[in-house]
């Protein structure tokens, strides 16, 4: 039986380390701080460019000496490095990692350097982020320094309250601002921080002016800029005149801010962020995926942003023991299987994934678990599970605090119509309290429907209920908490998507059934005019597909992937089509916008992500 390479390497290392420990065939002794380390030249040279140059070059006196004294490294660190060279084992902790990195950099053992940088990347926190950035720069680990600086920017609100902020070098602050890393405070607050920093360090006016030149003045309104004049800081007043001379025109400033207001769900600060198209989950040739792909409009390419996480514990307690057992069983599935048919929403530029289902051995398991993704910090956290396990429901954000979940296929101990009606088919999630609350129920229960929010009103249309495809449209006023039935859609429809631009709602995609119960694609985009409570045909879809992902990017409706109805095989598509509501024209850029793989049943959203990650 053949031995794998890894097993052979382990066997070789064990043999070499045994020879070293026994002092057999060793041909060099390293002396560090009075400590003696016996080793084999060839082993050291194979692992270190430093030792390779020392022992392979006959002109080097060390190549002929049996004992070599090393300076600039500690004996403890050298011991760890030699153990790693002979065993591939490296014991790192917060107390010895800097010492080990310094020694590994000195003797050029790349694998140890990499282990140290990975260890420190995982340990970056508010207490050490500046120290790690400074250390990384000293040892030339610029990727690690970038990670630390990006952490500082993503947590700038908290970092600014620490003593490290005032201890940050002027060159470091200038560097991170010039890199345009995303930050978690408004640009106006950044101006105040810089002024405070300048006052504390008693910077010369020229130095502060250089920092202020890096401010994104287009993200500060005229009224906000006036508030700076009331601060008790003379340098602010002096610089404002320079701003008027050097900044872009106020019309451009206002136009940029108006755009942010229209988009509604923008980040705290636009610095270093770009509006991007996200494709979430769905089916590909390899099956159901948890990947979240992102299309960068500046680089015109797709890349993997993140993935819907697996959770390994059930944090919520329930007063229903039987339901606890069911949820724990479903939890064991969520750890190992990708999810589908979940609810998706963007609130305050954070992505929420709630509920969904898993197919295991042709049986569907619905689960209640939820996740929240912050693109600024590239991090996921769990949220409270939804009260009624749901899939194929709508999830929509209202304002800056709430998510509304409506309808869907549900799973509960008593799933009768009467029981579900008593439970309510509508729930609201509060991001402040991390709780779900039942809301007034939608009279017509449904799943595979669509929902969209305009102002403080939630609109629901279509879907399936008791094997009947619906055309009805409803509106929920989140202020009065009342439902109102509106004009029905021109045709019954399910598995479609609603998007809103101005005071018009667009129903995109979906299908309905003929009298013979065969599925027929909806070939048009229908527009609902809110003021007149009427539907009309907006446009014909050039190549309609089943299960396309649909969203809007500014004033354009985008269709991603889907299943072609005209093909019996190879039905899946990677095509991305878009409809401009202002010009009434469709476009398709095959070489850039199309997804890397064929995809269907994915969910699409637009949100701001850091431009530096792509």
Language model regions located:
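Alpha-helical scaffold in the C-terminal half of BTB/POZ domains
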Residues: 2-6, 10, 35-39, 46-49, ...
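Kelch-like beta-propeller repeat domains
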Residues: 205-614
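Short amphipathic alpha-helical interface patches used for protein-protein assembly/oligomerization
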Residues: 50-56
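A short, compositionally biased
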Residues: 20-27, 573
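Conserved AAA+ ATPase "SRH/arginine-finger" region at the nucleotide-binding site
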Residues: 69-72
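Short strand-coil-strand connectors
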Residues: 31-33
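Short, intrinsically disordered linker segments that flank or connect zinc-binding domains
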Residues: 15-18, 119
